[in-house]
A protein has these predicted regions:
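Short, acidic, Ser/Thr-enriched surface-loop or helix-capping motifs
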Residues: 87, 93-94, 116, 121, ...
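Cleft-lining beta-strand/loop regions that shape enzyme active-site pockets
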Residues: 148-154, 162-165, 207-210, 378
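Short glycine/Trp-rich loop-beta-loop segment that forms part of the substrate-binding cleft
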Residues: 98, 120, 153-174, 254
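Glycine-biased strand-turn-strand hairpin within the trypsin-fold
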Residues: 23-40, 44-99, 107-109, 120, ...
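Residue-level recognition of beta-strand microenvironments
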Residues: 52-55, 95, 102, 127-129, ...
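Bacterial N-terminal signal peptides
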Residues: 7-17
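Active-site loop architecture of trypsin-fold serine endopeptidases
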Residues: 25-26, 31, 38, 60-62, ...
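C-terminal recognition in membrane/secretory proteostasis and scaffolding
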Residues: 2-5, 21-29, 36-40, 89-91, ...
Length: 463
């Protein structure tokens, strides 16, 4: 029992060092400091943390009705529908009623509601979705007041061991506060977004916490709680949050009226440094981002970056792997330049890279209709911007599938987001108009050549 009490007291002093912790990280100097409470912080923060409820119409699953031939033969239009509901959390980031949450909380929603800490509810519209970061921004409808917001902390200033509070709506029970510490920084192997650079915390995070706030001891937002590692479905002390510096970029795009996030584009393909590569380069440790190739007429090319260069730092921040570089590069504001340190031939060079967006030549996105296997797929031309978004080579031939509608013919035959269609029935597909035209033709068989994960696949489907 003594040990339990001691551990509890230890956590109290670690977690309640209040404002001074963010500044000098000192230990408590008196018993009075040990009796401090989180309540003042929570009272400031809670009004800006909201509950998010999303609803969408889905089809009841029946394996017999999955077969289009079965449906056509018996004259069945489709599977019966029902309303599916999900819940999560969000953070108010602008007094006008802008709320940041996770894309996976509101994905596919036909209706979104936001419940405030004072129990008032508002209909909300989705103003921006950024699947690459799993962040979305909502706007409260029919609201004419100023709402409480959270200030952003600089997540780069976080340290392992810093005290944090997680606030959200776990399991839909209502707003809940848990405490813990920053367990790790720059987690890059979580595998849930394009930008792998998460804050890890042992503050209890459960289903329903997604989109909620992770705050420091000054009540500032340091992250958006997004995922957990769990074998049971509940908290096991390993939670992940998107750093506030990434959240700030997405929120700023929404505040400026953008429908998509505009980010700097390097125009180079990077790869991780393996122990073998490190040994061949004479490195003590396998760290950095190795340049595999550089696209012509890109910011990387203009800066003088070359294949086989090893990026070791950006603006003074060390780079351990390509994920770290991607995160640090894209959280820079557009305009101006960024200084990159590279190793080339045993020497360190400093290169100045312009912070520009990828050129977005006419992507001409089309949602394919008709009775072909492509029905329900949205396809786009492969511009540099599309290639950057979907991790493709910009010089790849074909058109890429950017979305696959649930229950569509394209989904039923197994097409996936990111598939590149290069030929159909021996006709080369160079742009979306080519595929749109071919997909409207009648055919008994569809012979399709596509790229998936860098591998060419030839398939034949019935008409």
């Amino acid at each position: 029992m003594t040990l339990i009490r001691f551990v509890a007291a230890l956590f109290v002093f670690l977690l309640v060092a209040a404002p001074s912790l963010a500044q000098d990280r000192r230990v408590p100097s008196s018993a009075a400091e040990l009796r401090l409470s989180y309540a003042p912080i929570v009272q400031r923060v809670q009004p800006a943390v909201v509950n998010v409820y999303a609803a969408k119409v889905v089809q009841n699953h029946n394996p017999f009705l999955d077969d289009p031939l079965f449906r056509r033969f018996f004259g069945i239009p489709g599977q019966p529908e029902q309303m599916q509901r999900s819940l999560g959390s969000g953070v108010m980031v602008d007094p006008s009623g802008l709320v940041v949450t996770n894309v996976h909380v509101i994905e596919g929603a036909d209706q979104v509601k936001v419940s405030l800490s004072d129990k008032r509810e508002f209909e909300a519209e989705i103003v921006l979705k950024d699947p690459r970061s799993d962040l979305a921004v909502l706007r409260l409808k029919d609201s004419h007041e100023k709402f409480p917001t959270l200030d952003f902390a600089n997540s780069d200033e976080l340290m392992v061991g810093d005290v944090v509070l997680a606030i959200g709506n776990p399991f839909g029970v209502g707003q809940t506060v848990t405490h813990g510490i920053v367990s790790a920084l720059a987690r890059t192997q979580v595998g849930i977004t394009d930008y792998q650079f998460f804050i890890q915390t042992d503050a209890a995070i459960n289903p329903g916490n997604s989109g909620g706030a992770l705050v420091d001891m000054t009540g500032r937002l340091v992250g958006i709680n997004t995922a957990i590692f769990s074998r049971s479905g509940g908290s096991q002390g390993i939670g992940f949050a998107i750093p506030s510096n990434m959240v700030r970029v997405v929120a700023a795009s929404a505040k400026s009226g953008g429908k998509a996030v505009r980010r700097p584009w390097l125009g180079a393909h990077l790869q991780a440094v393996t122990p073998d590569i490190a040994d061949s380069l004479g490195l003590k440790t396998p760290s950095g981002a190795l340049v595999a190739s550089v696209l012509p007429d890109s910011p990387a090319a203009h800066a003088g970056l070359k294949a086989s260069d090893l990026i070791v730092a950006i603006d003074g921040q060390p780079i351990d792997d390509p994920n770290a570089f991607d995160y640090r590069f894209v959280t820079h504001p557009l305009g101006g330049t960024s200084e990159i340190d590279v190793l080339r031939g045993g020497k360190t060079l400093k290169l100045s890279v312009a912070l520009e967006t990828a050129p977005d030549t006419n992507r001409n996105e089309i949602k394919l209709e008709g009775r072909s296997p492509f029905q329900g797929a949205t396809v786009a031309n492969i511009s540099p911007a599309v290639a950057d978004e979907m991790h493709l080579d910009a010089d790849t031939d074909g058109v890429v599938m950017t979305e696959i509608a649930d229950g569509s013919a394209a989904a039923n035959v197994g097409f996936q987001k990111g598939d590149i269609i290069q030929a159909v029935n021996n006709k080369r597909i160079g742009k979306t108009g080519d595929l749109d035209k071919v997909s409207r033709e009648q055919a008994r068989l569809w012979r399709i050549t596509l790229l998936r994960g860098g591998q060419q696949i030839n398939v034949t489907l019935g008409g």
